[in-house]
Each structure stands twice: as C-alpha cells, then as structure tokens.
A protein has these predicted regions:
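Beta-strand-dominated extracellular/periplasmic modules and repeats
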Residues: 2-173
Length: 173
C-alpha cells in the first residue's frame, strides 16, 4: 500500500470480549503440535491513515479453536509479535469455529449470543491509542447473525493446498 494524500478509514474498534489475557508469548505460530483444524496463515500490515507502514507495532491475537472453545487459562491460540519495518506481521493458526457465548445483562439474566468465526486483535503503536478489534471470514453463513460483524473487518481469503491465507490491513489514526 503506497503512501497517499487521501486519508484511509481507521479500522473500527470492537469489543475485547471476555477472553483476552495479558502477557501472551511473543511468537508467530500460536498452534500446538497435532492441533485439529484447517491451517490459517493470518497476515497483513499496520499502516497510518496516509497508508504509511507502522514499524514496531505490537499486534496481539487470540481466538477460539476449531471447535469454538477458548483457552482461558493458558496461551493456546494466543500470541503477539512486532511488525517489521514495512508494518507487516504473520501468525500461523487454525480457522476458528463459530460458537454460542453466554451474555449476562445488568439484571443478572443470562442468554446465549451467537458469534461467527472471527479473530480478536489488539494493535498498539507508539503515540497512538490501542486498537482492539475483530476480523471475520467472508462468506460465512452466520456473519449476519453476529452483532459485532461488519463488512469493514473482513479478511481477504486465499485458499492454498496447505490451508487458508487470511489478509487484513489495520489502519491506525
């Protein structure tokens, strides 16, 4: 993405959800040996609103596994890394599954809320606010049922013999 005089739209902030854990390990591969699921290379860039790459941005990812479960005590399918000089990052993971999550309202009533397949992401860069967002998979029939879903946060998916590649450019203000 070349630097431009036109301002790009900042990536939309979304809920962190209840499953973020601080202190994730710095690593590219967030899977474990023998983990079930379709391989996914999640890669992309972090840029400013002019399209200029942001080097040394901290990008933290966490997600459900291929059965729709989160590791809430450890760091399976969790990790962070720093972007390179061109603002690029890559994480090796698996395609997550949709799931139903409990949501408790102010009156203490709990109901189940559908979540389509997604990846959670936090991006932190010098002199900028932390971006917390989620990215989604195009064509998932459950996307429209998810309250957080939006076309503005869709991964660009390429299918390869080894699995999927999901790409996204995060734009920070």
């Amino acid at each position: 993405m070349a630097t431009t005089l036109i301002e790009l739209t900042k990536t939309r902030t979304q809920t962190e959800g209840p499953y973020w854990l601080p202190g994730s390990p710095e690593r590219k591969d967030v899977t474990e040996p023998g983990m079930p699921g379709e391989p996914l290379l999640f890669r992309g860039k972090v840029v400013n609103i002019r399209g200029k790459p942001i080097a040394d941005a901290w990008i933290d990812v966490w997600q459900a596994d291929s059965q729709g479960s989160y590791d809430i005590f450890g760091y399976r399918l969790r990790g962070h890394q720093m972007t390179d000089a061109e603002g690029r990052f890559e994480h090796l993971t698996v395609v997550p599954c949709e799931y139903d999550a409990p949501l408790t309202n102010a009156d203490g009533e709990t109901r189940m809320v559908y979540r389509t397949a997604h990846l959670h992401v936090k991006v932190k860069a010098p002199q900028r606010s932390t971006l917390t967002t989620q990215v989604y998979f195009p064509g998932n029939p459950g996307n429209e049922r998810d309250r957080g879903y939006g076309d503005d946060c869709l991964l660009e998916i390429t299918q390869t013999p080894e699995g999927k590649i999901g790409e996204f450019t995060f734009v920070l203000g």
